[in-house]
């Protein structure tokens, strides 16, 4: 698997935008009643091949979103994009959430729902077919999509791993 370390990407140098995927209200029962808290899952990306996600928890919605954005900026990965789509088909699993992603021809558009759509939009992928299988929990679906994008490798990386030129990779 071709994994780009998050340490090599400096989020301060990127023009990152954020997208809110899901807000969840939690309640803690105390002696005087219920105390509410919020958690927010946020996807950040520059729409040019960099994407990350973050989880923020706080007593107020705005604070949870701000914490999620900061967390997302710490988890940015590089995604290989070939002509506006992904280099190859992949099935990624996280928990009981499974995400299938297939490359599509230019003009197809982004065929994805909810959490996967947010991840792919922020990564800058325009043409892809996806199907979310298993759990629909947005936390696990986002993590599965990120895991799938992180494990992708383009032809250059394959050639580098095999110590072959690009021409030799396509001949074998």
Swiss-Prot record:
Q: Output the superkingdom of the source species.
A: Bacteria
Q: Which Gene3D superfamilies match?
A: 3.30.160.20, 3.30.230.10
Keywords assigned: Ribonucleoprotein, Ribosomal protein, RNA-binding, rRNA-binding
Q: Which gene encodes it?
A: rpsE
Check the record and name the NCBIfam families matching this protein.
Answer: rpsE_bact
Q: Which residues form the S5 DRBM domain?
A: 16-79
Q: Name one Pfam family in it.
A: Ribosomal_S5_C
Record-level GO cellular component terms: small ribosomal subunit
Q: What is this protein called?
A: Small ribosomal subunit protein uS5
* InterPro entries for the chain: Ribosomal_Su5_D2-typ_SF, Ribosomal_uS5, Ribosomal_uS5_bac-type, Ribosomal_uS5_C, Ribosomal_uS5_N, Ribosomal_uS5_N_CS, Ribsml_uS5_D2-typ_fold_subgr
Which GO terms fall under biological process for this protein? Answer: translation
What's said on domains? Answer: The N-terminal domain interacts with the head of the 30S subunit; the C-terminal domain interacts with the body and contacts protein S4. The interaction surface between S4 and S5 is involved in control of translational fidelity.
Q: Per its record, what are the GO molecular function terms? A: rRNA binding; structural constituent of ribosome
The similarity annotation says: Belongs to the universal ribosomal protein uS5 family.
Q: What does this protein do?
A: With S4 and S12 plays an important role in translational accuracy.
Q: How does it assemble?
A: Part of the 30S ribosomal subunit. Contacts proteins S4 and S8.
Residue ranges annotated as transmembrane are none
